[in-house]
Amino acid sequence: MKKLITLIAGLLLVALPVGLAGCDDSDKEIYNDGRLVTDVVIPTSMTVYRGMEVSVSGYGFAQGDAIALRAGEDLPAATTVASEKLLTFVIPDGAADQTVYKVVLNRAQDYQVLGSSKMTVQLAIDVDLGKTISGNWGGDAVIRGRGFMATDKLLLEQGGGKFEAPVKGADDSSLTFTIPQNAADGDCEFTLQRGAEEQALGSAKLNLSLGGVTVPDKEGATIKGIVHLAGQGIADVLVSDGDLITKTDANGFYWLNSEKRNELAFVILPAGYDVPTVKAMPQFWQPCTLDANTVEQLDFQLLRADNDSHTMLVATDMHLANRNTPKDYVQFADGFVKELTSAYNSAAPGKVYCLNLGDFSWDHYWYDTKWALPECKQSVEDFNFQMWSVMGNHDNDPYVASDFGAEGPYRQHMGPVYYAMNIGRIHYIMLDNTEYLNTGGSQGTVGSRNYNRRFDDRQLAWLKEELTHVDKSTPIVVGCHCPLYSYSGSGGVSVALQTQADIDKILSCFAGFSNVTFLTGHTHVNRNIQSPTYANVYEQNIAAVCGTWWWTQQYGNNNVCTDGSPAGYKIFTVDGTDLKWQYKATGLPIEKQFITYDMNEVKEYWATDATALKAFAAGNDMRNRDKDYSTVGENAVYINVWAYEPGWTVTVTENGTPLDVKQVWSKKDPLHSISYDIPRGAANNGTLTFPSTSCMHMFEVTASSASSTLEISVTDRFGNVSTESMTRPKALTTDVTK
């Protein structure tokens, strides 16, 4: 029998007394001008579960009395009378949550309203998870509470993924469940499910043990551990300290003769597996906590994953620093984070990942605005998918004038600065190609934050060793912050690292691999460049999430990069070894891949707009900007195709007649100019921090008149088509949707 709850007046803080007279139950509480029972108090609110027995004390109860809950219609409740002083009824299955019920006593033809109560109806009540639930994978654990049923389902949620924990049984005071194999150490949300109903039970920390597994010491090893699936060791998994790479034995054990230089160790995720996730951060690394001469055990849990097909969201240059108007973190939350959580948080675990290509933070403001890597991590906690990261030049400690030392906070909060993982059948390698010099930096003093764009020799040695474990036919995706290449002039390619020798050092590591894609950021523009000297290497330099460092919202009510690309990210769709990609402008439909400019209107704006004329007159960085489009002919139209790359086609027709389309290599984008350069120049004496850059994906056509309508179609290398019917004249506006 379920435990009884006795509702006695002396224990109630707030109650409604039974009325004294009346013949209807709308305001008066006694039928037939007399009381059936007395001294009854019904609480104004109750938290109950269906099937729960509720006892009411009073005087005058009789065998045959019945209780109904009245909210419009009567809902009969099974009733028993223990004595003339105690009646018990059962909360019926039809009781509705957050409903005010009148508790009606029925006796033959008479009835009496005993009182009214707002009922909070739950699946279970008095649930106590405790702060920590300890146990082993496959072992039993208990949740205290009342109202559980053996047929209930228990759902656990960790890192955005929900999975079932089998219910073993239930009694009057608890529910017993089996800890599933895909549970992980750390915070966990618990949800009770019964049919179509769910109830959040709360959260607790899972403290899961390996059941006494101890990895034996080995001579010379300072780091040891086990790589396991639910406590069972996994053989042939690579583990590294950033200098050495080793492989687990048949028991899943590993040993590293480590100097602990990086003060951490990490697992190189094997295909078919995943790692647990905590607040969007993949748990693939562990910090060392003991000195270099002391042996410590660092264990790694893996989870099964069906991720041969997955989506990889590639984003870069968030530059979160608690500055700008509106604040950068507000723009980030309202734009990028909101869009990704809405679109991808409901995806199954192992189906969506994110790559962050660096400049998550902004070193210059770490100490001034109290916003550094920990705050940046908090800004993405709502992601129900993993965000894997590399560091950018702005993710270094600006008080430290050495590359390795300045990386310390990153290793502490984000993990290794270079590593690798297999997600599905793609081998991802995350590298660090900023050598942070930071001349003049010291504790309390921000240095010059200067850096070199190169891969250091230790990292290259590690990379060469890591690649010996990868089949040459495997597609390779390399993420790093700084680009390898840039454009020079009309389609020419130049080296963006320090020297050609730096290019050769990194790209020669991939000799024999046929499909190597580098994903980079740093520039805040879109560029796609085939390596001119390494046929197997293709680079995609991706525009920034922050656009122009979060400035254009203030001036243009938009978020635009210096080449006119709307701030955004790239979506990679992976099916086995096949990769496809599209640029996604934040806040715009993915079908929109370009913007058009009626250059007649642009030139008119340059010649007549008061703010533009003020900015041009200010000189400094705005000197000669009045001549931006002085050589552009009449009836010209510009088309900025944001993510254009080899294999795309741009076609334009006027009244059914095709127009000649030519690529323009040296012009600035009008949208960025009116969203930042002109208003900022006018307000700041012509001085610009982030001026428009030459756009390398601009196209031009010349129409036959100023008022014709143009039909424009852009087709990418995968057959995706974007179109616009451009009605002219078309006004120049900061609205990126136009």
Question: At which residue positions do the language-model features occur?
Answer:
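Aromatic sugar-binding surface patches on proteins
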Residues: 81-90, 170-177, 669-700
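N-terminal active-site segment of His-dependent metallophosphoesterases
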Residues: 214-222, 229, 273-367, 738
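Short, acidic Ser/Thr/Gly-rich low-complexity loop/linker segments typical of extracellular
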Residues: 80, 168-171, 243-258
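Beta-strand/beta-sandwich contexts
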Residues: 24-63, 110-150, 199-214
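Short, ordered, surface-exposed loop/turn motifs in non-cytosolic proteins
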Residues: 151, 221-243
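Binuclear metal-dependent phosphoesterase catalytic core
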Residues: 537-643, 648-650, 696-703, 709-724
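C-terminal motif of bacterial Sec signal peptides marking the signal peptidase cleavage site
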Residues: 18-22
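Extended active-site neighborhood of metal-dependent phosphoesterases/phosphodiesterases
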Residues: 271, 275-277, 283-287, 365-470, ...
